[in-house]
């Protein structure tokens, strides 16, 4: 599979194989990016129709990667409304709208294009504006957080979304260094605020940039909404696939899939179920999938990726 110059799709082969039993005809790519996953799916499943969603205008500007691709500029936190509108097409008013999608795919996080474009402000390795907005039309940018928010709020973001143990120390340094003029300045302030032993490990700004980016884009809130919508609108026998890149996202996906897979809670000596609980999901693979060494040799950025899948068993 050729690499996409905009964004190299992670575990595209695994995604295709997990969807072969479904033979999807209608699928949502909730994180279109440059269309890497969509391209692989269109090649694998002739006749497939894809609803391709992305909030980044740069991604939408790439255009559809093939026939049958319907582009929607939106955050996947709005997926419930988007799916309802599509599933209701051709259905009379007042009629119950059944789930109509065969699969949903989420590739969570920042794209290669966003990291490599210094003007987007996502990378601590490149000098650019302190921005980090995936949707450039959004009001909140990273500059507001680092240059206007109080210490306590910044520290909360770094701890909550970056799991940064030195959150308060770093937050105080950021406030003291104001105005933070660009991403290189922010990365330098963070590096200088931590002990030398910490600097000798991974770059100390890594978790800080992750945390601020998640806060700016409300990534976890959007994931929660998008995941619920996907489970609601995928048909029985259809699948929901999620590729995540850090523990916060993965824990959310793991817990939701586990909760959906829980069935009857009655004591084992009950002759019949009285709780009425029925599992809505099951996992067709025992363990989450990770990139192969061959893929990592071509795309080292995929190293932290985790792919989970759940299949709908009931409405």
Enumerate the predicted regions with their spans.
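S-adenosyl-L-methionine-dependent methyltransferase catalytic core, i.e., the SAM/SAH-binding region
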Residues: 1-315
């Amino acid at each position: 599979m050729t690499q996409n110059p905009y964004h190299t799709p992670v575990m595209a082969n695994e995604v295709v194989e997990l969807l072969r039993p479904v033979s999807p005809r209608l699928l949502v790519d909730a994180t279109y990016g440059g269309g890497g996953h969509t391209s692989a799916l269109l090649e694998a499943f002739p006749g497939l129709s894809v609803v391709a969603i992305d909030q980044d205008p740069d991604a939408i500007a790439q255009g559809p990667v093939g026939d049958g691709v319907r582009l929607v500029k939106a955050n996947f936190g709005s997926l419930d409304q988007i799916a309802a509108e599509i599933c209701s097409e051709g259905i009379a008013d007042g009629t119950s709208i059944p789930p109509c999608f065969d699969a949903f795919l989420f590739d969570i996080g920042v794209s290669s294009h966003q990291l490599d474009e210094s003007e987007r402000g996502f990378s601590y390795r490149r000098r650019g504006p302190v921005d980090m907005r995936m949707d450039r039309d959004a009001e909140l940018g990273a500059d507001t957080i680092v240059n206007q928010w109080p210490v306590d709020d910044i520290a909360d973001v770094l701890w909550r979304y970056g799991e940064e143990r030195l959150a308060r120390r770093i937050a105080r340094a950021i406030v003291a260094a104001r105005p933070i003029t660009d991403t290189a300045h922010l990365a330098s302030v963070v590096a200088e605020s931590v002990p030398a032993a910490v600097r000798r490990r991974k770059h100390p700004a890594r978790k800080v940039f992750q945390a601020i980016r998640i806060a700016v884009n409300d990534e976890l809130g959007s994931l929660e909404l998008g995941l619920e919508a996907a489970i609601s609108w995928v048909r029985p026998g259809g699948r929901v696939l999620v590729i995540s890149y850090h523990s916060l996202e993965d824990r959310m996906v793991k817990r939701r899939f586990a909760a959906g897979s829980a069935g009857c809670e009655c004591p084992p000596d009950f002759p019949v179920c009285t709780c009425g609980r029925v599992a809505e999901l099951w996992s067709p693979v025992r363990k989450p999938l990770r990139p192969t060494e061959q893929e990592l040799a071509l795309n080292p950025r995929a190293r932290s990726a985790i792919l989970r899948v759940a299949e709908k068993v009931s409405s």
